[in-house]
UniProtKB/Swiss-Prot annotation:
It comes from Geotalea uraniireducens (strain Rf4) (Geobacter uraniireducens). Its main location: cytoplasm. Belongs to the QueA family. The gene is queA. Monomer. This is S-adenosylmethionine:tRNA ribosyltransferase-isomerase. GO terms for molecular function: S-adenosylmethionine:tRNA ribosyltransferase-isomerase activity.
Length: 343
C-alpha cells in the first residue's frame, strides 16, 4: 500500500485547539465494522455500548512535562524535548534539541532549578543522547521546570490547564511525551458507570513516544520502520485478556497505544505475554488482529500510522467513509477532539 492511500481532506478549523469543557462531553461516532453502520452519541453515554462480560483495557501512562527551555554556556537559547529514557539510574534521555546551531558532544545546557544537561552523542531520528544532573529527584524537578508537550498542530503554548486536561484521570506511570488521547474523555464517574455494566477494566502501560509526532517518510508502506515504545503488561491484565479470548468474550482497547501493546505482546502464539518490552509493531490493512475486538479512539492525522492501524481494524473504505461523514458533521479532530467507538 502507498502512503497517499491514507490522505484525506480536513479543514483546519476542525482541528481542536482546546479540550471540550467537560471530559465526557465530546461527541462519539460509532462504527459497526461488519456492516459499516454509523451512529452518533456523546462520550457520557458510552457505557450503553458495552456488553456484560466485556474487558476494557486502558493505558495508565502519565505524560511528563517534556519540553524544557535552557541556555548554552555561551548564553544562546536552547529548547530540549525529552523523547524517552535511555538509562535509569543515570537519567540519560533521548532528546530533540532545537538551537541556532547543532550541539556538540560534551556541550552543556543550563536549565532551571540547577539542572544541567550534557549532550553525549547523536541518537536515532535526529535526536541526541543527553544526561541530566542532579539525578536524584529529576522527575520531580521536571514537573516544575518543564511544560506539557502539546502536539505541533495545537497552535498555542501549553498552559496550566493542560497539565490536567492533557492527562488521563487514571495516569500513573510517568514516561509518556504524548497523551493516550482516547483516554482523555473518561472521568472516574464514567469508568464506574462502565463497571456497573459488568465490564472489567484492566491497565497496562505504554509510554507514548516521539513516533506519534513523526511523519511517515516512505511512499511504499512496506519500507516503513516503526518507532519503538516501552510497554509493561501486568500479569493480572494478561490473565484477564487471555481468559476473555478463551471464553469468546470481547476485548475493548481504549486507544491505539493500548492496541499496539496488546498486539505486540501476542505476536508469538496469540496469547498475551505479561512483562515489559518495546513495541515496534506496525499495524496496517492486511493485519489480522489477535487480541483487540473493539476500539475507542480519536480521529487521527492524514497519512499517520495511527490512521493505518484504525483502518486495519475497521476496514479502510468504511473508516474513510466515517471520516468524510465526521468532516461533514463538523466533528473535532486529533488530540483534543472527538472520538470513535469501532466494534
Amino acid at each position: 500500500m502507498q502512503l497517499n492511500d491514507f490522505d484525506y481532506y480536513l479543514p483546519t478549523e476542525l482541528i481542536a485547539q482546546q479540550p471540550a469543557q467537560n471530559r465526557d462531553a465530546s461527541r462519539l461516532m460509532t462504527l459497526d465494522r461488519v456492516n459499516g453502520e454509523l451512529n452518533e452519541t456523546i462520550i457520557s453515554e458510552i457505557a450503553a455500548l458495552f456488553r456484560d462480560g466485556d474487558l476494557l483495557v486502558i493505558n495508565d501512562t502519565r505524560v511528563i512535562p517534556a519540553r524544557l527551555l535552557g541556555k548554552k554556556e555561551s548564553g544562546g537559547r536552547v529548547e530540549v524535548f525529552l523523547v524517552r529514557r535511555l538509562l535509569e539510574p543515570g537519567e540519560v534521555w533521548q532528546c530533540l534539541i532545537k538551537a541556532s546551531k547543532s550541539p556538540k558532544p560534551g556541550s552543556l545546557i543550563i536549565l532551571s532549578e540547577g539542572v544541567v544537561a550534557r549532550v553525549l552523542e547523536r541518537s536515532e531520528l535526529d535526536t541526541w543522547a543527553v544526561s541530566f544532573s542532579p539525578v536524584e529527584g529529576f522527575l520531580d524537578r521536571l514537573e516544575r521546570i518543564g511544560s506539557m508537550p502539546l502536539p505541533p498542530y495545537i497552535r498555542r503554548s501549553a498552559g496550566d490547564d493542560d497539565r490536567e486536561r492533557y492527562q488521563t484521570v487514571f495516569a500513573r506511570a510517568k514516561g509518556a511525551v504524548a497523551a493516550p488521547t482516547a483516554g482523555l474523555h473518561f472521568t472516574d464517574a464514567l469508568l464506574q458507570k462502565i463497571r456497573q455494566q459488568g465490564v472489567e477494566i484492566a491497565p497496562l502501560t505504554l509510554h507514548v513516544g516521539l513516533g506519534t509526532f513523526m511523519p511517515v517518510r516512505v511512499d511504499d508502506l512496506k519500507d516503513h520502520r516503526m518507532h519503538r515504545e516501552y510497554y509493561f503488561i501486568p500479569e493480572a491484565t494478561a490473565r484477564a485478556v487471555n481468559a476473555r479470548k478463551n471464553d469468546g468474550g470481547r476485548v475493548v482497547a481504549l486507544g491505539t497505544t493500548t492496541t499496539r501493546a496488546l498486539e505486540h505482546a501476542a505476536a508469538g502464539n496469540g496469547s498475551v505475554q505479561p512483562g515489559e518490552g518495546e513495541a515496534d509493531i506496525f499495524i496496517c490493512p492486511g493485519y489480522t488482529f489477535k487480541v483487540v475486538d473493539a476500539l475507542i479512539t480519536n480521529f487521527h492525522l492524514p497519512k499517520s500510522t495511527l490512521l493505518m492501524l484504525v483502518s486495519a481494524l475497521a476496514g479502510k473504505d468504511r473508516l474513510f467513509n466515517a471520516y468524510n461523514e465526521a468532516v461533514n458533521r463538523n466533528f473535532r479532530f486529533f488530540s483534543y477532539g472527538d472520538a470513535m467507538f469501532i466494534y
